[in-house]
Amino acid sequence: QPTVMRFCRSIGVQGLADFKLKLASGLTGGAITVAHCHVEISDSDAELARKVLGNNASAALALRDMLDVKALTAAIELLRGAQRVELLAVGSARVVADDMQQKLLNLGIVSSFFADPQAQEMSAAMLKPGDVALVISRSGALPELLRTVKVAQGCGARVLAITASGSPLAKLADVLLTLNHPEGNLNFVPMIVRLLQLMMLDILSVGLARRDTAQRTSAAELEEGQLHGMRISGKLKFGGHLE
């Protein structure tokens, strides 16, 4: 019995009964999922690592299975046709927004992101019809972010939101990519939602990158030429953001 229980836990199931259920699901065409486990203070380092990695894998599989493909297609087309993309995010989502802006620039898409919420609102006020506000938020309920989104909409920009379903931000969005995931019960548990946001943006980036190959290649060559010149002149000491 102890050996069986250790095996079950190692593959992310709660016990023999849970393993049989997951196995039966796999044999009937379903997928054996990775169970979500809460991190406890009493956990060993090995248990901590297993749970964190297992939770990340579980969240990624859930995103794959519940992704709204129609909304994804609409989001890719919206970004492809945008004259300018303004990224809006606060808190930990700012890191995600900054990463996406770099991706958009690499794809030759005019984009901007300001970490300061007031600067975001000022920049949103300069948007025009044909522009897109890409908004990233776990809760979709922060007042300052919602205010900035309304400013962008008032200027004629369309809103693409990556946030929780049913949130105030979700209700404002022209196109919504839903991310719902409960966080752990400890402050030091990594934010799985942030990883899901990054994965969602990776999906969008790949969707954009598979088209307009000539434009993408031209932008990449231009950037590489600029970085090479900066390296030669000694102005770039730590390489570009692609390195």
Where are these regions (language model features)?
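Glycine-rich phosphate-binding loops that contact phosphosugars or nucleotide phosphates
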Residues: 80-199, 203-212
